[in-house]
């Protein structure tokens, strides 16, 4: 199973890339984690946010390989603790499909992304900086993998 993180935004600070890569390189070859960046629309004083969100949504949906399970990360989703994420990962593996996890931009995800989602995951009721979410998701997925494989990374 391949896991694809699709995130709105590019040109992240180096600490984001370094933090994200710390976890990517730990994943086994039979479960690689990849990142697809979607350019964020220009936002300014007179920006048409609905149009920007729609364009980001189109680009996000186009980046999802056909047949992938779609999981959106959003504040209205269900909070998952580590055992729940590990359980979901096992179900995803048994499903036999690859997984695309979607992270929206400053205004969140486009309605078409949310509508296509099979699962909605809330990392926190807090508003988190989008660059930090990439690292948190990568670490959480690695931790869940370690639970499922009895790897010593996770400790109860």
UniProtKB/Swiss-Prot annotation:
Compartmental location: Cytoplasm
Gene3D superfamilies: 3.40.1280.10
Name of this protein: Ribosomal RNA large subunit methyltransferase H
Keywords, comma-separated and alphabetical: Cytoplasm, Methyltransferase, rRNA processing, S-adenosyl-L-methionine, Transferase
GO cellular component terms listed in the entry, alphabetical order: cytoplasm
Gene name as annotated: rlmH
Positions annotated to bind S-adenosyl-L-methionine: 73, 104, 123-128
Phylogenetic lineage: Bacteria, Pseudomonadati, Pseudomonadota, Gammaproteobacteria, Alteromonadales
InterPro entries given in the database record: Alpha/beta_knot_MTases (IPR029028), RlmH-like (IPR003742), tRNA_m1G_MTases_N (IPR029026)
């Amino acid at each position: 199973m391949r896991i694809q993180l699709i995130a709105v935004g590019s040109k992240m600070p180096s600490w984001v890339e370094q933090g994200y890569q710390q976890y990517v390189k730990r994943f086994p070859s039979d479960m690689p984690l990849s990142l697809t960046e979607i350019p964020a629309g220009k936002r300014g004083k007179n920006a048409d946010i609905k149009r920007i969100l729609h364009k980001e949504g189109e680009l996000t949906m186009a980046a999802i390989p056909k047949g992938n399970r779609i999981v959106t990360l959003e504040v209205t989703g269900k909070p998952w603790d580590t055992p729940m994420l590990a359980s979901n990962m096992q179900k995803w593996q048994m499903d036999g499909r690859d997984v695309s996890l979607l992270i929206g931009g400053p205004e969140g995800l486009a309605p078409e992304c949310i509508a296509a989602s099979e699962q909605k995951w809330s990392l926190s009721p807090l508003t988190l900086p989008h660059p930090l979410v990439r690292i948190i998701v990568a670490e959480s997925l690695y931790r869940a993998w370690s639970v499922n494989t009895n790897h010593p990374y996770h400790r109860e």
